[in-house]
């Protein structure tokens, strides 16, 4: 398992514990609406900035129970707080504070509201 994937798995575990919710590594099969909101964490891109520093892009997708256009809870504050807490307690050699941006908000195939957060970090490889 690469260090990138270890960090992604650590973020999944950290979010799951801090939000007290199940966090997925790929889009799950939804059996009932009680599973919403869905939180899916995936590795997007990674590249070496220098021989010792690696850049990692992670997408955190939140899919809410509500249909797009309604009022929905994208959990942005909760996710931001949980990621800050994870970072503060992280044992990884992360360079500086990671960036969290809202990358995109668009409906899923079945019309539910979906928000993608782009989490970027650099770490000592």
Language model features by range: what are they?
Residues 24-33:
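Short acidic low-complexity segments
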Residues 1-24, 42-125:
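Charged, amphipathic alpha-helical segments and their flanking helix caps
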Residues 33-44:
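A short, hydrophobic beta-strand-centered structural micro-motif
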């Amino acid at each position: 398992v690469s260090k990138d994937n270890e960090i992604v798995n650590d973020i999944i575990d950290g979010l799951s514990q801090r939000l007290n919710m199940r966090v997925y590594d790929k889009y799950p099969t939804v059996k009932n609406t009680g599973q919403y909101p869905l939180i899916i964490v995936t590795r997007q891109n990674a590249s070496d900035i220098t021989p010792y520093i690696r850049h990692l892009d992670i997408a955190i997708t939140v899919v809410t129970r509500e249909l797009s256009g309604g009022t929905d809870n994208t959990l942005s504050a909760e996710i931001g707080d949980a990621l800050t807490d994870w970072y503060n307690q992280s044992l990884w050699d992360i360079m500086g504070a990671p960036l969290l941006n809202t990358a995109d908000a668009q409906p899923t195939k079945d019309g539910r509201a979906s928000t993608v957060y782009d989490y970027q970090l650099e770490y000592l490889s």
